[in-house]
Every structure is written in C-alpha cells, then in structure tokens.
Amino acid sequence: MSDDNSHSSDTISNKKGFFSLLLSQLFHGEPKNRDELLALIRDSGQNDLIDEDTRDMLEGVMDIADQRVRDIMIPRSQMITLKRNQTLDECLDVIIESAHSRFPVISEDKDHIEGILMAKDLLPFMRSDAEAFSMDKVLRQAVVVPESKRVDRMLKEFRSQRYHMAIVIDEFGGVSGLVTIEDILELIVGEIEDEYDEEDDIDFRQLSRHTWTVRALASIEDFNEAFGTHFSDEEVDTIGGLVMQAFGHLPARGETIDIDGYQFKVAMADSRRIIQVHVKIPDDSPQPKLDE
C-alpha cells in the first residue's frame, strides 16, 4: 500500500516538474505576479495553446478576486420581490412573469426582508386547496452579506453552504441589492442564457454596478445620452465603430481598450465585425439614465 502511495506521489511530482519545465521553455520562467500571469494566459491564447473561451474563463477567475459583491449585485431597484401577505395565485403571477426561481420576501418595503421563497416549494399547494397556502410554511431564512465581501469568497460560501442567493446590505444595515451564484459564474464563463431568456434588441443591459453589456450597433448618440458621455459621432455612428476606430483594427473577443476612462471589452465578435461589448464605467460616474 505504501509503495502505491509512493509511486502516486512520484507521478504527481513528475507531472509538476514537467509543467514547470514546459512553462519555463515557452515563457522564459514562471510568472512572478498577477500581471505576468495574465500576460502568460494571453500569450497562451495567441500561441493557440488554449482557445478563446478558456482564456476568457481564466481571466474571469482572476478578475473576481479583485471585485466586491457591490460591483456585481443586482441593485435594490431591480429586485423582484414577493410580499409576505400575498396569496398563492398572486405569488404564481409574479413567478410566471419573471421566470425566476428564488425571491426575497418583504413585509413593508425592501428594507424589511423576511426570508427567501423558492418557487419549487409552491408545487405541493398547487395540487391541493390553495387556501392551505401560507407564506410562513415555505419561507426560508435569508442569507445576508455586506457589500464589501470579496466575490471569490462569496462564491466559495455559495458552494460550501449550498445556497444560491444572498441579500446584500450597506454599512448602515439597509438593503442595497442581492447577489446570486449565477451572477458570479457569468463573470467567469460569460452570460448564461436559458430557455426563458428572450432574444431582444435592447442596446444597454446592466451586468453589475459598474459594467454594462452594449450592442455594437447601438448609436453613439444614444450611448452619450444614456451614460452622460461626449463621444464624437462625426466619423463613426455606432459603439462598435467607435471601439474599432480606437483599436485601429478589428479586435478579437476579449481584447480591451480604454476610451476616455471607459473600459471597452469585446464580448462578441466574428471575422467581420464587433457584435457586443462590455463597458465598465468609472467608479465615480452616475448610473446611466435609461428609458423604462
């Protein structure tokens, strides 16, 4: 038995030695800091050692270590909630309309979170008398986390504690939003769409507090109006054109450029055009003004 363990340890050691040697040969030494590691990942993509999706996921994993829950949470104003005194039918109306599976339950307002309701917990009441339904019978305890919690630690907590949603509070104890495990995973693997996600032509969609998805065909005029910017549309009309002009070439997915303090990352592109970008606005910028 000990011989087997010794053989296994030797094998692992040999593998580690092999990969260290490989890194040394390809990249002239192992990375010493975060910037060198990022450069190594990008070089690996350019050398076709990893594909674009893998590169983006590796970069995403590194990015979450620098972010706080406040950066990715769903803002309080966009939270879809249920009220503690709602009937079964009223709850079902909200669930069907939103197609969500978890809901904060409030009493008076969004600062008074009573717990979390999971849509699946309503199924037994749909087969019996709806009058038997009571929110108290299905209410689950809400997990509360501070805005300042690191995203990587939040993901670890989601996994270890096996829950998918947490209520986010500010330093004064007021509710500022909510965060889900899906929000974090989307930072790593990109937007997760399911059968209930509708394909639409919305130009601007919020991903986190400071990051927005923007269609490349969105006009610069509309972007300026929404984000309070002053990008010129004299030479190009669209955000995709603005980004391509700034790069000076057709950028590949994952390439990033800073334009007047706004960080533009190519989220989708093909061999002919940019399709979608992620825009990170400066921390001190006001939230965009969008038509409801």
Curated annotation (Swiss-Prot):
SUPFAM superfamilies: CBS-domain pair (SSF54631), FAD-binding/transporter-associated domain-like (SSF56176)
InterPro entries: CBS_dom, CBS_dom_sf, CorC_N, FAD-bd_PCMH-like_sf, FAD-bd_PCMH_sub2, Ion_transp-like_CBS, Transptr-assoc_dom
Record-level Gene Ontology MF annotations: flavin adenine dinucleotide binding
This protein's GO CC annotations: plasma membrane
Pfam families listed in its UniProt record: CBS (PF00571), CorC_HlyC (PF03471), NMB0537_N (PF21917)
Keyword list, A-Z: CBS domain, Cobalt, Magnesium, Repeat, Transport
Keyword field contains Magnesium: yes
Tagged with keyword Transport: yes
Coiled coil stretches, renumbered: none
Residues covered by the CBS domain: 73-133, 135-195
Function: Plays a role in the transport of magnesium and cobalt ions.
PANTHER family: HEMOLYSIN-RELATED, MAGNESIUM AND COBALT EFFLUX PROTEIN CORC
Similarity comment: family membership: Belongs to the UPF0053 family.
Designated name of the protein: Magnesium and cobalt efflux protein CorC
Species this chain originates from: Escherichia coli (strain K12)
Top-level taxonomy: Bacteria, Pseudomonadati, Pseudomonadota, Gammaproteobacteria, Enterobacterales
